[in-house]
Amino acid sequence: MQQEEIIEGYYGASKGLKKSGIYAKLDFLQSATGLILALFMIAHMFLVSSILISDEAMYKVAKFFEGSLFLKAGEPAIVSVVAAGVILILVAHAFLALRKFPINYRQYKVFKTHKHLMKHGDTSLWFIQALTGFAMFFLASIHLFVMLTEPESIGPHGSSYRFVTQNFWLLYIFLLFAVELHGSIGLYRLAIKWGWFKNVSIQGLRKIKWAMSVFFIVLGLCTYGAYIKKGLENKDNGIKTMQEAIEADGKFHKE
């Protein structure tokens, strides 16, 4: 390894003590991937909550993202492509974020002491974001893998079958809180870091952050309840397999 690389690796500076720009670039990439995922989270929540309007509305939304405007019956593979893209962005964001995680017990103790002494709200928020991000990486990966491999199962009957009969309700309740807290805290910290709303005070941004958290968690819980209710109805109506659930969704299709 070159001497310059060793110096830069230890101190983040070149041999001439010129600050390396790689860390700023990595920081920008972390912010960019986080913003994309946060915006996707917001859009995704509004889309899945369409079941609160009606089963048919949720079916139409699902088909819209299968390209039903251009392909009469829609193409589930389009959803798989989107899921694959989100997985790649999620993995990239996770690896970029890991740079700032305590990597051993000593670093964790330093952070914990700092957090205790400072008693600063944003430091506590970062800790919550780190915990939810760690949980979300595993929980969201499972959900995205299902969307990648079974895109045709997305629909009012298929999704609710997965919720109840396949017991995904347990995963989704933890994923709901992890995603909504992580996303809202992330957007708040991005707004401060990049100075997006200079006319809004930090106190104002915090209020917006908590309003977002409450709104999306309440919307998510209502949506969660709707899928549970629909999944129980599936059982009462004799739907015993995912294929039967998919066929039940197909009844909403209009030639």
Swiss-Prot record:
Binding site for heme b bP: H93, H182
Keywords: Cell inner membrane, Cell membrane, Electron transport, Heme, Iron, Membrane, Metal-binding, Transmembrane, Transmembrane helix, Transport, Tricarboxylic acid cycle
Membrane topology: Multi-pass membrane protein
Record-annotated membrane-spanning stretches: 33-53, 78-98, 126-146, 168-188, 208-228
Chain residues that bind heme b bD: H44, H143
GO terms assigned for molecular function: metal ion binding
Cofactor note: Binds 2 heme b molecules per subunit, called the proximal (bP) and distal (bD) hemes.
Subcellular location: Cell inner membrane
Assembly: Part of an enzyme complex containing three subunits: a flavoprotein (frdA), an iron-sulfur protein (frdB), and diheme cytochrome b (frdC).
Function: The fumarate reductase enzyme complex is required for fumarate respiration. This subunit anchors the complex in the membrane and binds a diheme cytochrome b.
Family membership: Belongs to the diheme cytochrome b FrdC family.
Protein name stated in the entry: Fumarate reductase cytochrome b subunit
Annotated source species: Helicobacter pylori (strain J99 / ATCC 700824)
